[in-house]
Amino acid sequence: MTPSTASAPRASPVREQTTVAASAGRIFGLVLRYWYVIRSSWPRAAELIYWPLVQMLMWGFLQSYLAQASSFAAKAAGLFIGAVLLWDVLVRSQLGFSVAFLEEIWSRNLGHLMMSPLRPAEFIAALMAVSLIKLLVAMVPVAFLAYFFFGFNVLSLGFAFAAFFANLIIMSWSLGLVSTGVVLRWGLGAESFAWLIVFVFLPICCVYYPVATLPGWLQPVALALPPTYVFEGLRAIVLEGAFVGHLMVKALALNVVYFIAGSIAFAYFLRSARIHGTLVQMGE
């Protein structure tokens, strides 16, 4: 056989599956699957929008009432609405991450995914992307209605909004990693943990009031949480018109620690689930 007719050596199938392009393709395929599920069911999309809309309207009307009776509330116009919108960024992103994972269990598909070429890191990346998609589906209409009803434009915060958004998203992913890891290890008996974990932080993160409002012994706990700095930063902008950059730096530093800890926890729970055989029993 001449060199011109000799067939070129083909890459190993294993090597083909480990390329960056193959990894990106698996992530994109999983994200596309989740997107089709959302797009094909209007009740799912309506559910994503419902609670953020109700919260925004409730706090917005309360703020309008207080502004008529209090000079401080009039000065702080947009404080409650901004706080509830940012809080919902954290909540919707974490739930978007966790619920996408739970849907794999409910459909008894998790074991198939774990036996496929899909790597755990790729699965996590897909869940992160899906959480962003669900967040946009939920919050874009609500933010528009906040401007329509109350004249509050979240984009008027400028660069500060980008910093707030990024820090809350990273924190939501950290919570999502821990909550899904717990469900991996202990099964659907721990499902409520995935739904409730973010709300544990609501009174401690000082969403609607400053850190100084908390008891002295609880303030260090609040200051150890990244969202606290986000909401303190929001109050600084609304009340003083100043963007306090060092608050965002502290939030980012804490987020790095929490995200690494969440990743380690997820890897540990996944390994434990494989050892104890709970992966194949999910959904049964």
What annotation goes with each model-predicted range?
Residues 2-284:
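Hydrophobic transmembrane alpha-helices and immediately adjacent juxtamembrane helices
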